[in-house]
Regions:
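Specific transmembrane alpha-helical segments of multi-pass solute transporters/efflux pumps
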Residues: 19, 23-24, 52-103, 136-140
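Transmembrane alpha-helices of multi-pass small-molecule transport proteins
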Residues: 33-82, 107-113, 166-173
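Hydrophobic transmembrane alpha-helices of multi-pass small-molecule transport proteins
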Residues: 51, 73, 105-107, 112-113, ...
Length: 186
């Protein structure tokens, strides 16, 4: 199967990667002057403004069901509040580079959890190999020296890894519980 991406798709992909990757650096800088939870609050607040502007621009209506709003609140906790708090707190004791490498664990957890909870997603060795290749690429890009800085007694590393578990869990939970909701909303 040949997969083609337009120049616009490549540009958007690069922009997303730059935004996501730079978030670790910005967290590291902001931790010098702000409390971790203030950083999380500001990060989520800026994102909320952007999402609301997007919804207004696209004329996407918000759901009216209390059940859907409850599920969206749970998703917000699993996909944003917990991971953002864990990563920001974790970065008090680890570098941005190491945090970004550990963040790649989300793909590993995603493969495991989707094979466990989603009937249409069966475990396949090629997916695991893909995750390993992806994590290897991140290690090469960010720098092998960051791997050497891993300290099993450093709680920050475990907090970032736990955050990646919540990213993977939230994606699987949303696919099960919010499969009828517009992805722009969820």
């Amino acid at each position: 199967v040949e997969i083609y991406m337009s120049k616009k798709s490549w540009l958007l992909t690069l922009c997303m990667g730059a935004m996501w990757g730079s978030s670790f650096l910005f967290i590291e800088i902001l931790l010098k002057t702000l409390h971790p939870f203030m950083i999380v609050f500001l990060r989520a607040g800026v994102a909320l403004i952007g999402i609301l502007l997007f919804l207004v621009y696209k004329k996407i209506k918000l759901p009216t069901s209390k059940d859907v709003w409850l599920k969206l609140m749970i998703l917000g906790i699993l996909a944003n509040a917990l991971p953002f708090s864990l990563i920001t707190s974790g970065q008090e004791t680890i570098s941005a580079g190491l945090a970004s490498i550990l963040n790649a664990c989300a793909a590993f957890f995603g493969v495991i959890l989707s094979a466990t909870f989603l009937s249409e997603e069966k475990f396949a060795i090629n997916r695991l190999i893909g995750v390993i290749i992806g994590i290897s690429g991140i290690v090469i890009t960010i720098g092998y020296e960051n791997i050497l800085s891993i300290d099993i007694d450093n709680r920050g590393q475990y907090l970032v890894i736990l955050a990646t578990f919540f990213y993977a869990l939230s994606a699987n939970w949303a696919k099960i519980k919010l499969n009828t909701v517009d992805p722009a909303i969820s």
